[in-house]
């Protein structure tokens, strides 16, 4: 790793370069944000080849690889699943793992989530500005600046481009098996100063099978909510039908009173022969459900005041309201684990599904670093069994832990302190899941600064241009420190000659 004096000298040159390149850096990020890279169905290109995450994700990937080639970097496209932009020589590699895919935009934005561009006030706006296109582009411009000022890293610097981080993360695993692991590095996909621990992640579904009902009365025709399991849902919707449409007036009045009493907005409107009921919440990252307002919980709380012809539907709604509801710590399902290292478990319901066969929810748990996933499931099962609820395990990511005095953690902490002047900051444990779990020797480093508004997975995501430029500086310093400077053989000989005189 480079010494502090080397970091200071090269950082000064980089600072001047950033000042000259600020407009280009902002425009490149705005262009990347304009590509709506939400994962979609695979797109066939030719026999035996496809874009596994859809056209838009591939477009964002192609854009970054094009920028890399234009800057004179080596690039790699690993079967359209992941890739990298790289410069420098050396046997070892510093890896920076970032991702180009984004979660769905959702509703309620004050500006277009993909085409808002840069505001007159200097805000770079749109989905991905914080998570993770802004940090990714900041690392790219740090690399570009270092190359253009003549920095020669002793280790290769590799910006690894993930394409499905928000869903399975399988693309990165595919890439790492073929390209190999970097020796050390970081991912700019969390918050500052440094994340030395990440809670474990469980994704699973809870569902109840539905029997046919021959009764007549208020029928639940449709029920849905949420776009992704790792997002607090911002909206949810039900469609109900009655053989006596006059009953809709009573339902609408109940909805009005519910909203007035609870403070949760509900909207009702006639839709053909049915009545639509829509709940509005506040989206947030699924790892911090307490920062959002769950629209699924709002909708089911209201539907609990109605009685449907299918008693299994009524029982599911009662189960949800009593054992999940608005709680975000899993206490209703007897899984409110916590520890001194990482704090409390968090519980998010991200999606709601319904058809004539079953009704269910997709859930996301972030559990303490000293727990095991099976402990969580074992704790929940007695409650689930009592209500005839089925559980389907989807994904599990075990916790990540580095000691606070680990050399990598300490090096990145020092970079952060030098840049910000914050000598009181300490390494953190996060509920978020990052690529650091898949890549030993890496931790999350930024990109959200303490005190800044966290808009990740939320509407109106944006970053100030000044913060973005600061990210370029801080990541540039981190790359200088971690990669080290390759010594010119002639300089080494001069140093030996001086020592011998």
Question: Each predicted region: which residue ranges?
Answer:
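A short core secondary-structure module
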Residues: 205, 211, 215-216, 231-243, ...
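Acidic-glycine-rich active-site phosphate/pyrophosphate-binding loop
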Residues: 103-119, 207-214, 269-279, 414
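An extended, acidic, His-containing surface patch that forms the Zn2+-binding/catalytic region
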Residues: 278-283, 287-356, 362, 366-378, ...
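Short beta-strand-to-loop capping motifs
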Residues: 87, 208-210, 240-244, 279-281, ...
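Active-site metal-coordination/substrate-binding segment of hydrolases
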Residues: 93-161, 167, 183, 458-459, ...
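Acidic/His- and Gly-rich active-site-bordering loop/insert found
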Residues: 2-127, 148-153
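Predominant activation on well-ordered alpha-helical scaffold segments within soluble catalytic domains
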Residues: 30, 65, 137-144, 173, ...
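Acidic/histidine-rich catalytic neighborhood of metal-dependent amide-processing enzymes
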Residues: 132-211, 252, 256, 328-341
């Amino acid at each position: 790793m480079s010494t502090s004096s080397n970091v200071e000298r090269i950082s000064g040159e980089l600072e001047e370069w950033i000042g000259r390149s600020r407009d280009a850096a902002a425009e490149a990020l705005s262009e990347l944000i304009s590509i709506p890279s939400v994962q979609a169905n695979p797109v066939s290109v030719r026999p035996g080849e496809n874009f596994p995450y859809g056209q838009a994700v591939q477009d964002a990937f192609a854009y970054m690889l094009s920028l890399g080639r234009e800057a004179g970097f080596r690039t790699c496209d690993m079967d359209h699943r992941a890739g990298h932009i790289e410069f420098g020589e050396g046997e070892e590699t510093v890896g920076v793992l970032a991702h180009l895919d984004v979660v769905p935009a959702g509703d309620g934005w004050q500006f277009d989530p993909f085409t808002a561009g840069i505001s007159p006030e200097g805000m770079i706006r749109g989905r991905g500005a914080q998570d993770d296109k802004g940090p990714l582009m900041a690392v790219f411009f740090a690399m570009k600046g270092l190359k253009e000022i003549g920095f020669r890293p002793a280790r290769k610097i590799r910006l690894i481009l993930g394409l499905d981080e928000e869903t399975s993360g399988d693309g990165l695993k595919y890439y790492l098996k073929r390209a190999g692991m970097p020796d050390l590095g970081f991912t700019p996909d969390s918050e500052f100063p440094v994340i030395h621990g990440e809670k474990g992640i469980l994704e699973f579904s809870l569902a109840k099978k539905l029997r046919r009902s021959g009764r007549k009365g208020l029928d639940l025709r449709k029920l849905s909510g949420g776009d992704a399991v790792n997002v607090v849902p911002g909206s949810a919707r039900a469609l109900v039908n009655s053989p006596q449409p006059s009953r809709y007036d009573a339902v609408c009045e109940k909805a009005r009173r519910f909203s007035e009493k609870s403070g949760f907005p509900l909207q009702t409107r006639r839709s053909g022969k049915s009545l639509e009921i829509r709940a509005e919440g506040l989206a947030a990252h699924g790892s911090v459900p307490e920062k959002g307002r769950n629209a699924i919980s709002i909708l089911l709380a209201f539907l609990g005041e109605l009685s449907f012809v299918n008693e299994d539907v009524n029982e599911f709604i009662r189960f949800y309201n009593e054992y999940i509801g608005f709680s975000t710590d899993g206490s209703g399902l007897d899984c409110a684990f916590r520890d001194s290292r990482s704090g409390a478990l968090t519980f998010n319901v991200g999606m709601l599904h319904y058809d004539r066969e079953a009704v269910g929810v997709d859930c996301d748990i972030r559990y303490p670093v000293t727990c095991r996933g099976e402990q969580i499931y074992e704790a929940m099962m007695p409650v689930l069994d009592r209500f005839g609820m089925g559980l389907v395990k989807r994904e599990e990511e075990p916790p990540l832990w580095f000691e606070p005095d680990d050399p990598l953690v300490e090096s990145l902490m020092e970079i952060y302190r030098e840049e910000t002047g914050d000598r009181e900051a300490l390494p953190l444990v996060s509920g978020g899941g990052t690529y650091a779990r898949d890549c030993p020797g890496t931790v999350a480093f930024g990109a959200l600064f303490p005190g800044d508004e966290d808009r990740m997975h939320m509407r109106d995501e944006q970053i100030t241009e000044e913060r973005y430029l600061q990210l370029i500086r801080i990541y540039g310093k981190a790359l200088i420190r971690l990669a080290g400077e390759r010594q010119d053989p002639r300089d080494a000989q001069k140093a030996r000659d001086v020592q011998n005189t």
